[in-house]
């Protein structure tokens, strides 16, 4: 079982997507594999925060398998686990922005980007860590603490999408979303040996680039193909 788990989590996002679509791996098996890896490593790296209940996530994965059995395929992320950066809203999940001001805030609706990821079939397992309000080239906040680099958890993962970068680099996530004003997608990519791509500010949907001309959301991936595919999902 351990071998199968590591094999599933080491697949690229596109390989994992195809394995699920062709029923070479069930959504439950994929969720079990990722949860096993998270429980084994996340306490050292602190990449994923506000992790949802295992039983609830496995129930959602079972429903996704049931949909596949009935010929209902939601999209390329069908049944894949995903954790959104804790600067964006996921309905029913903590939405702290890394600040004590919002430590008890629960999102009442999905952001536009999260809705697109959900429409592609993803199962939201938690959030990824960020500095308070995303302000910093590290990922520490007073609620969840600091996130460590995938290559040395004693060193910073970068920021502000450091939880996303570390989660990808440790293979606890297939792809990840982040945001960038002054390097917040790019430096976690470098610090964790993954790709953090900052799109032009007019690429992402559901936002008015004129209101925040320097900031934009964007994709992170373990390789170029995964990153491009995920950009197509969230743009």
Locate each region found by the language model:
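An N-terminal boundary/leader segment
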Residues: 1-60, 70
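Structural signal for hydrophobic packing residues in well-ordered secondary-structure cores
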Residues: 24, 35-45, 61-69, 118-121, ...
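Short, well-ordered beta-strand elements within core beta-sheets of diverse protein domains
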Residues: 15-22, 101-105, 215-222
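Enzymes and membrane/adaptor proteins characterized by extended Gly/Ser/Thr/Asp/Glu-rich
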Residues: 10, 41, 76-113, 140, ...
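Short glycine/serine-rich loop segments
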Residues: 109-234
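Conserved hydrophobic/aromatic pocket- or pore-lining residues that grip, position, or stack substrates
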Residues: 34, 57, 79, 85, ...
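Immediate post-signal peptide segment of exported/extracytoplasmic ligand-binding proteins
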Residues: 64-81, 226
């Amino acid at each position: 079982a351990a071998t199968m788990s590591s094999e599933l989590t080491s697949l690229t996002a596109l390989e994992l997507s195809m394995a699920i679509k062709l029923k070479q791996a069930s959504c439950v098996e994929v969720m079990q594999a990722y949860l096993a890896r998270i429980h084994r490593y996340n306490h050292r790296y602190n990449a994923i925060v506000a992790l949802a209940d295992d039983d609830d996530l496995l129930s959602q994965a079972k429903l996704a398998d049931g949909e596949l059995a009935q010929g209902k395929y939601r999209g390329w992320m069908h049944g894949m686990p995903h954790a959104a950066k804790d600067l964006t809203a996921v309905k029913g999940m903590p939405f702290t922005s890394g600040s004590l001001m919002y430590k008890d805030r629960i999102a009442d609706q999905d952001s536009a980007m999260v809705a697109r990821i959900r429409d592609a079939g993803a199962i939201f397992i938690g959030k990824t860590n960020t500095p308070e309000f995303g302000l910093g080239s590290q990922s520490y906040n007073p609620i969840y603490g600091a996130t460590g680099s995938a290559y040395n958890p004693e060193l910073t993962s970068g920021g502000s999408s450091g939880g996303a970068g570390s989660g990808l680099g440790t293979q606890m996530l297939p792809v990840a979303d982040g945001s960038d004003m002054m390097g917040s997608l790019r430096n976690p990519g470098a610090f964790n040996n993954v790709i953090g791509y900052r799109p032009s500010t007019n690429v992402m949907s559901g936002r008015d680039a004129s209101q925040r001309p320097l900031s934009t959301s964007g994709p992170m991936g373990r390789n170029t193909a995964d990153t491009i595919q995920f950009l197509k999902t969230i743009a």
